[in-house]
Amino acid sequence: MAQVSINRDLGEWGLSTDSGERARLLQSPSVDIAPKSEGEAPPGGVGGGTTSTLGAIFIVVNACLGAGLLNFPAAFSTAGGVAAGITLQMAMLVFIISGLVILAYCSQASNERTYQEVVWAVCGKLTGVLCEVAIATYTFGTCIAFLIIIGDQQDKIIAVMAKEPEGPGGSPWYTDRKFTISLTAFLFILPLSIPREIGFQKYASFLSVVGTWYVTAIIIIKYIWPDKEMTPADILNRPASWIAVFNAMPTICFGFQCHVSSVPVFNSMRQPEVKTWGGVVTAAMVIALAVYMGTGICGFLTFGDAVDPDVLLSYPSEDMAVAVARAFIILSVLTSYPILHFCGRAVIEGLWLRYQGMPVEEDVGRERRRRVLQTLVWFLLTLLLALFIPDIGKVISVIGGLAACFIFVFPGLCLIQAKLSEMEEVKPASWWAMVSYGVLLVTLGAFIFGQTTANAIFVDLLA
């Protein structure tokens, strides 16, 4: 096997080990990785973690499944029906799995343990900064989507509890959507977001898994045994245009994006080997595919092209089984928002400390003031935007393009740089194939990012 000469000296990339940029981000709630030491064995050696292969599959599935599930029936409608939606997901799955394997390979080569650290080490300073900015933006947008989801589910629950018709007009002020979102956010989300450390991640992980599987089960059951008042609208059989198919890309990328948290999972395994990891992510993505397809197909066929961007909004408020699903989603989002905010705040903190040239070991008072200020600004901005953005589809259409960067662009760049760093005088055909595949990933990811972002700006946000 060719020797890989990826530079592991942080100074050569213009980094400083005391500037905070090495913060661990988006680590899975179930992953526990000991800090690296100077003489530690690289991943794949005897210094592996404690996670079994089966445990790694569960963690990756958990990282993959989330709030994007609610938008999949609408994505099938956008793509042009069941056949187009299935074809698009199956085609994307190949690239999604390969991106996860590439990240594991580059993690071994660079001896780094988180997504952004791998990008920093393999691709250099500029790409590393872009990656961190993308992570911060992505987590910010996801927090907005979480608040919108809370408002969506609360509207339906309050309509039943207050025994009043849904929609504007005639409702008491305390049932107003903006008031209920703000009250919930200030009472629950803000206090959970301020602490320096997050110790409840395992509970959020459990709630997310239970809520996701329950929502999927309810949607499938409601399709098989529909209520009398639920009649589907037009069922599309083909896409209106090829552009319509690509408009479903953001939801798929947002739904399957687990790449940022995959690197810590890989390094937490007892035997962190690329071959074993390939089996782990293949099994995990097949499970996630089954969940997303079940939700997307049954939700779309139940409501047709009239399905809401949040599929649970399409069901009657009085349906108790769906009401339980809404409660699960709210609880899951309430605990997931602080985790995503923590990840985004860690990136911003690292960028700020690096820019200022400040050491991590500063006095506690300054760190606390800066943390509270960062949290308040983040919280208020996401809340303000969530109050005026009507549905999660518009948010996902924007951050889905960033998810494509995590799935395609950064892994592609890492693969190219890793292969270019191999010290071989004669490049075999496999070397050229890998470089070409990396170029394909970058090109495809850049196209998806550009097309979906432009569409989101000119069609969704400016409409």
Curated annotation (Swiss-Prot):
GO terms for molecular function: L-asparagine transmembrane transporter activity; L-asparagine:sodium symporter activity; L-glutamine transmembrane transporter activity; L-glutamine:sodium symporter activity. GO terms for cellular component: axon; lysosomal membrane; membrane; neuronal cell body. InterPro entries: AA_transpt_TM. Keywords: Amino-acid transport, Cell projection, Ion transport, Lysosome, Membrane, Phosphoprotein, Sodium, Sodium transport, Transmembrane, Transmembrane helix, Transport. It comes from the Eukaryota. It is found in: Lysosome membrane; Cell projection, Axon. Pfam families: Aa_trans (PF01490). The keyword rRNA-binding does not apply. Signal peptide: none annotated. This is Sodium-coupled neutral amino acid transporter 7. It comes from Bos taurus (Bovine). The gene is SLC38A7.
